[in-house]
Amino acid sequence: MDLSDSPKGIETHTPMMQQYLRIKADHPDTLVFYRMGDFYELFFEDAEKAARLLDLTLTQRGASAGNPIKMAGVPHHAVEQYLAKLVKMGESVAICEQIGDPATSKGPVERKVVRVVTPGTLTDAALLSDKNDVYLLAMYTGHNKRGVAVNIGLAWLNLASGALRLAEIEPDQLGAALERIRPAEILTADGATDAVPAGAGAVKRVPAWHFDIASGTQRLCDQLDVAGLDGFGAHSLTSACGAAGALLLYAAATQGQQLRHVRSLKVESETEYIGLDPATRRNLELTETLRGTESPTLYSLLDTCCTTMGSRLLRHWLHHPPRASVAAQSRQQAIGALLDAPADANLDALRSALRQIADVERITGRLALLSARPRDLSSLRDTFAALPALRERISAIVANADALARVDAALAPPAECLDLLTSAIAPEPAAMVRDGGVIARGYDAELDELRDISENCGQFLIDLEARERARTGIANLRVEYNKVHGFYIEVTRGQTDKVPDDYRRRQTLKNAERYITPELKTFEDKALSAQERALARERALYDGVLQALLPFIPECQRVASALAELDVLAAFAERARTLDWVAPTFTDDIGIEIEQGRHPVVEAQVEQFIANDCRFGADRKLLLITGPNMGGKSTFMRQTALIALMAYVGSYVPAKSACFGPIDRIFTRIGAADDLAGGRSTFMVEMTEAAAILNDATPQSLVLMDEIGRGTSTFDGLALAWAIARHLLAQNGCYTLFATHYFELTQLPSEFPQAANVHLSAVEHGHGIVFLHAVNEGPANQSYGLQVAQLAGVPAPVIRAARKHLAYLEQQSAAQHTPQLDLFSAPPAAADDVECADAPAPSDATHPALDRLRDIDPDDLKPREALDLLYELRTLVRSHDADGHA
């Protein structure tokens, strides 16, 4: 059925379907959950889609306008689990509730859409991940007079917390920005040609006029209750203001109300944080492994936070390391104070207190949207009540750390808010207002009176039962209640002749009769009416409490922010103490100095980790790293980047000591993977990432290059690797860790004194190999590639053939006086000492016994096979001598 019927066409439907179709017309691209009794129903195409996505039963009931009505539904009490599934699939859902009274309605009960649930506007606890923020982002491309794109304005909002941010970026930085922000939903204008990277988030097209710059700027000012945006540094960000206007319009429309908690704005600048492109975030496994799991990552190692607010802030810090060392030093000062705290303010006691803290940030968001539930408010009350004791834990050390002093001041409990919550909300309220028992006794006299009537029913019934037994002489007479028939007096069949005349039969059972008396009927009317009136009164009072709490939203947000920061700092302190980390230092001079550094994540996975030094300075800008596969080259490079990032985030670091000069960006070119969706080969991906590094790296950038050039032929790869390394030294001048299997590159320090060779060593043991994982000065002299292949389980015949062919390649290389292109092997033997099945035969025939010996591996022989081989070799020698060979 076509849901775009004209108004005239709609009139041919039943009244209820007319109502539905009008609502659906306002939400054409959204699934409409239409409330009918205890179910949310979907109709027509929505029903078909929901049945497919949610595995619901698709039914067909009746017809409207001559068309069968396809239906699918979900029970209202389980709606959140279905919403969660749909949102995860990128779908949006309009929740249409009954707002009219069925008892007084003529025709269909009045209904309206009360909110729209979209991937980027989630606030319900059941739909949100505890440790992940959800962002709605709008993007608008600014053009010059010639129609050329000059920038992209971004505005993104965390609706659950009210955090709003703006930025303007270069068009080619969009992918990196989206990877950093990771929005769940992206708003773009109808007809816009901006290409949103695949997988960046669910894309929603909205009318282009929503992005009008003048309207957006005014809407932003109205939202923040300011006359202008100069105080936020946003007055010149016209493209971002256009995006913000569309964002606020969309977010408010989905909630059907004002966004009362969006009262602050932060403008992000490219120079504010250390640059991390998508490849770097992926390769360093900050919050997700290369396999797509959440552990083991740097985040999973660091996240010992006691609150979900702290866990979310930690994730944000890891993706936003500040360039200025001032912020890092302030955080590290706080960590030091927490570690040195006296016994009465020790770290364990503080963290124990933090575990009792609720998610104030998200509760405040729901409060602002008037969707907070009773237990949200009781959790808020209990958290505020615990703040004085929490402040006592840190009061003794605030003088030693400015960050802790700032946190302490922000944790002052909002007294009026706490008083209201304490007086209004029951100690242990029900989950939902409709269940009653939410408002505290003593808060409202009328509610208390109605409750007394309902709650005193029990005693009245006991007294009535005793009186009626005495009056009638029926010893087993009972006075009871059920929801279907209300209150009644039950008399067994054999005693009905004793029933007084004022008993009126209410229900006949097989073995008993149920009656009601005028006195019981009067009480029933009063009791049931009191219960209904009490629930209605409680609903009204609860709504009033929500309204009364709205002025305290800024104070609640202040407390939430301070609690999250304190939690992360305490987690950093716990990690530093448990894992033996140290406070790094910072300098304005060029350089990185790490003594006995360790990879934080790998160290946690192994029994013993070999620590290594890393030094950069004005005289040492590029380290050529050679050594065997599995020797630890990639681990060494990654640990250097992670230690640097941790230092600037504000954490202690896994090292004996560490000192860092300024770092503006971290780049990585690690691993091999193609981009099938983008039609790019492994080598193309490698070169694209290398190009970005060569174009953007500065003398303050840290660059990790792992085996560049391996995706093409040997000579092409070697030439590219040499040229790239040379450019990084001569042009970029950045700190570079350059791992390679091209031995020729180890000659680079002779041309550039700022380059140095280091290697990871290993030793052979029989036909095996032991990796030492220690970084030493100088180049490696062997790759141990065949030994690694043997460890990997490559069949022995393949290993033997590889050894023979390696010998041949070495012979050819020596004969042609060309450099050895293989993996750092030892100098080749003299040509006349090398034999290989694939090499041209020498002028004199080789001895057959020698050929046979070359084909065997003694380690593979059993005792009997060795004896048989000995006899075989003797036969070959005698046969060879008999043929007249010397």
From Swiss-Prot:
ATP-binding listed as a keyword: yes
HAMAP family for the chain: MutS
Residues that coordinate or bind ATP: G627, P628, N629, M630, G631, G632, K633, S634
Molecular functions (GO terms): ATP binding; ATP-dependent DNA damage sensor activity; damaged DNA binding; mismatched DNA binding
GO BP field: mismatch repair
Keywords: ATP-binding, DNA damage, DNA repair, DNA-binding, Nucleotide-binding
NCBIfam families according to UniProt: mutS1, PRK05399.1
Stated role: This protein is involved in the repair of mismatches in DNA. It is possible that it carries out the mismatch recognition step. This protein has a weak ATPase activity.
Gene Ontology, cellular component aspect: cytosol
Keyword tRNA-binding recorded: no
Entry similarity comment: Belongs to the DNA mismatch repair MutS family.
Species assigned in the record: Burkholderia vietnamiensis (strain G4 / LMG 22486) (Burkholderia cepacia (strain R1808))
Disordered: annotated span: 834-857
Top-level taxonomic group: Bacteria
Name this protein carries in UniProt: DNA mismatch repair protein MutS
Pfam families membership: MutS_I, MutS_II, MutS_III, MutS_IV, MutS_V
